[in-house]
Amino acid sequence: MDVAAMQVKIVDIIANQLGVDKEIITPEANVVDDLGADSLDVVELVMALEEAFDVEIPDEDAESIRTVKDIFDYLAKNKAA
């Protein structure tokens, strides 16, 4: 999967999990502050990303993910080949 396709898929997952419009999901958007996720939403989002990209995101890594760009960067670096 190329980077552009991966980013589209991530945006789709975020929109679905958080119930937000794709238009407000920018790389700089903070998942909690800008997209309105609470702690349960974040856990569910991480689980959805793990399933979609066949990757395990350890809790300590998940805690460092704040923005949509953080998600893009993490998955680009760690997704299964």
Swiss-Prot record:
Role this protein plays: Carrier of the growing fatty acid chain in fatty acid biosynthesis.
Keyword Phosphoprotein: yes
Keyword Cytoplasm tagged: yes
InterPro entries: ACP, ACP-like_sf, PKS_PP-bd, PP-bd_ACP, Ppantetheine_attach_site
BP term (GO), one: lipid A biosynthetic process
Top-level division of the source organism's lineage: Bacteria
Subcellular location: Cytoplasm
Carrier domain: residues covered: 1-79
Family: Belongs to the acyl carrier protein (ACP) family.
This protein's name: Acyl carrier protein
Post-translational modification: 4'-phosphopantetheine is transferred from CoA to a specific serine of apo-ACP by AcpS. This modification is essential for activity because fatty acids are bound in thioester linkage to the sulfhydryl of the prosthetic group.
Pathway entry: Lipid metabolism; fatty acid biosynthesis
The gene coding this protein: acpP
Major site of localization recorded for this protein: cytoplasm
HAMAP family noted in UniProt: Acyl_carrier
Pfam families (UniProt xref): PP-binding
An example Gene Ontology CC term for this record: cytosol
PTM-bearing positions, type O-(pantetheine 4'-phosphoryl)serine: S39
Organism: Syntrophobacter fumaroxidans (strain DSM 10017 / MPOB)
NCBIfam families given in the database record: acyl_carrier, PRK00982.1-2, PRK00982.1-4
GO terms assigned for molecular function: acyl binding; acyl carrier activity; phosphopantetheine binding
Keywords: Cytoplasm, Fatty acid biosynthesis, Fatty acid metabolism, Lipid biosynthesis, Lipid metabolism, Phosphopantetheine, Phosphoprotein
SMART domains: PKS_PP
Family matches, as SUPFAM superfamilies: ACP-like
